[in-house]
Amino acid sequence: MKRVVTLVSKEQAEVGHRFRVFSVPDECKSCRLFSVCLGRLTPGRSYKVVEVRPSMGQRCKITDSEMVPVVVEEAPIVGLLPLNKALEGVVVTYEDECAGCEGCPNDVVKKGEKVKVVKILGRKKCRNKEFAIVEFFVVSAPSHAVLDSSKTAQAPSRAPSSRRPLK
């Protein structure tokens, strides 16, 4: 799991604390601490504090609260993938097949991003299609190498062509 050092408020600086970054306020982008604070995190993703480091007295420009350095790891995303892509340990290209379904992770994963399935949690039917409810991590951004003026390159899915159905 990817770990990164960032800053959180003193109240959030507890091992095991989980939080989600929804967006980055404009005021943060001009702060001298941005590159070691929210600048290291991805909006839409969830994180878990795994280590608290000694405070160095930094203060938040917006809240004026004490900021504490912590080590966080990205928490897995829970969302829907087509059954043929849902196999633990497999890296697949997210194609947005579940758009419009409750539980579809469109707000945190972009079409074309590579995701690694870490756990299968169950099944769900939406729009007459079967999906697996899975935990996964984004492992790379979408590929944008131009093939010609109308197409972009996409790596083929490494999902197996056939597999046992989920129980």
UniProtKB/Swiss-Prot annotation:
Protein name: UPF0179 protein Pars_2336
One Pfam entry name: UPF0179
Family affiliation: Belongs to the UPF0179 family.
Lineage: Archaea, Thermoproteota, Thermoprotei, Thermoproteales, Thermoproteaceae
Organism: Pyrobaculum arsenaticum (strain DSM 13514 / JCM 11321 / PZ6)
